[in-house]
């Protein structure tokens, strides 16, 4: 019996596998110092050097590729992925990652705008079916920037807000107040008022004891809680 060797997260192998066996994939995009998209989650590459030198946005595409980081162009060159994406029935959830402060990118709006322009340039030629790509970010500016530039793809904001730097635990510790003080109903209302077609939220809003940690009527992914959720999000 062959043992499946799980591919590395955000690798070409993982994304190609996911697009073939599932109804879609999720991946993270950052921009290199050369202005190219790279598929990478963390804000820094591993190492002991200065954080500014390890920030993805301050590294060249060739440097990042030498570390095994795939570019978005490499992903789009894979017909096994793009053919099924164009055929319909598959969705790609694309997260725009906000740079680490060490990258010294102060104008987040301009950075998001550049990412949107580059994504359109990359994907529009594929003439993807409607609702086959959703872009989201933890940045609270994602919606307003998308409107200001007339972005062609639907966007939504990830909740609760997590800052773009720090360890996994620190990020979640800082995000805890926002989680506790928000409600599923409130998030749905906010996203709807901003014209967002979907609500992207942490699973803890709907599952486990954490769903009782914030005010409002608890919702869930099954039973009566799911019925309440479906009523609240009708049309989204």
Where are the model-predicted features located?
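Phosphate-group recognition and catalysis centered on beta-loop-alpha active-site segments
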Residues: 1-236
